[in-house]
Amino acid sequence: MGNKVIAMKSGRFIGVMSGTSLDGIDVVLAAIDERMVAQQASYCHPMPLQLKKDILGMCQGQSTTLSAVGKLESQLGILFAEAVLALLAKAGLTAQDITAIGCHGQTVWHEPLGEPAFTMQLGDNNRIAAMTKIATVGDFRRRDMAYGGQGAPLVPAFHHALLAHSTERRMVLNIGGIANLSMLLPDLPVRGFDTGPGNMLMDAWIWRNRSLPYDKDNEMDAPTFTASECLNVSVKTQKKERPHESIYSWYRLGKKCFPASWCRLQRSNCS
């Protein structure tokens, strides 16, 4: 991501996000006044188990049909709208109180190294707008790619708006399903890129081996290896498997870059 950051419009906005962890639909109500952002309410809407399985199957490249893709697009649009309506009820507000909804959509495929590069998010924004009666914007990733970005414009832009400094060099690490880094350097455009898997692989391992959605409060026994040791092994493995690629090209990542088989390999290497 390297596009110019523009000033934010004042008003109340709702953000809708469903990441690669698939642990729920996060919705946040924020009042924005130029560079000031005040969170006013938040809510996590549950993700139905069957829908989660359908999304995971698509992300892992299982065979599908156009009918299944279209159905999932509509189902997610309805689910996102229901999450927004639940947040409004919790906050005691109506559609007239909200300037706009920003909906990222659910990523099912992300291929920034493709020729041409592309990314795909599902979740019908038209359905969200119709059900909530609120203007809805989205499709952020594809626009970023069209301008030469890696398809992840939102987090770096947000970090820049809130944390950029006129003289200090700052970097912000955001750990989601895939971890990413924002570089905030004085007098230079904001830059952002992926650094590798975040909680996505941990969640996948816990689900596969303990039938739990995630490791709540780190209740599982502590590992016998350190994070740095495992990282070193992972980098060495990647260099061996992809000798002709620069390590910097690994920054442009998607969930398909780290399937369950990759997770098992890294765990066995670190044991």
Curated annotation (Swiss-Prot):
Enumerate the transmembrane spans.
none
GO biological process terms on file: amino sugar metabolic process; peptidoglycan turnover
Pfam family of this protein, just one?
AnmK
Q: Its domain of life?
A: Bacteria
* Molecular-function annotations in GO: ATP binding; phosphotransferase activity, alcohol group as acceptor
Cited InterPro entries: Anhydro_N_Ac-Mur_kinase (IPR005338), ATPase_NBD (IPR043129)
UniProt similarity note: Belongs to the anhydro-N-acetylmuramic acid kinase family.
UniProt name for this protein: Uncharacterized anhydro-N-acetylmuramic acid kinase-like protein
Q: Which organism is it from?
A: Yersinia enterocolitica
